[in-house]
Amino acid sequence: MPKTKKAPARKVAKKSVRKLAEHEQLRDAIIEGMQEKKAKDIVWIDLRNLKNSVADFFVICHADSRTHIESIARSIEEFVYKKLGDEPLHSEGQTNAEWILLDYFTVVAHVFLQDKREFYGLERLWADADIQRIASNY
C-alpha cells in the first residue's frame, strides 16, 4: 500500500490564516461601501465561534429611505467588486427595498429601514456573538 504524504501543519495553518484574512477583507470592504453612502449605526457580528452559524460575519446597517437603502446596497457591491473582484452569490429585497440582503457566503450584508431593523432584531437574535459597532464620523 503506497504511503500518502500529508501537508505539513505549518502550511495548513498559513492557508487558514490567509482564508480568514480574506473574510475580514470582505467584511471591511462591505463596511467601506456602507460608509461611502453614510449608512447609519453600522455593526458587524462575528459568528465564527457559534455552532451552526450561517456565515462568518454579518454586517448590518440602516438607512433613512428606500432610495438610501438601494444606494447603500449598490455601493457595497461596487466596493467589494473593485477591491476583491467578488459579486454576491445571492441578494434579496430589492423589490420592496425595506431590507436588502447581499450574501457573499462567508459575509452577509444587511441594509434595513430603521423600523425593519428594530422589528427583525438581528443583533438580539445573535446576541451571544461578538458584536462590534463602527464609529461614525458623519
Language model regions located:
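Long, contiguous binding/interaction regions
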Residues: 1-50, 64-71, 86, 92-94, ...
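A short, glycine/Asx- and small/polar-enriched loop/turn
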Residues: 52-56, 103-106
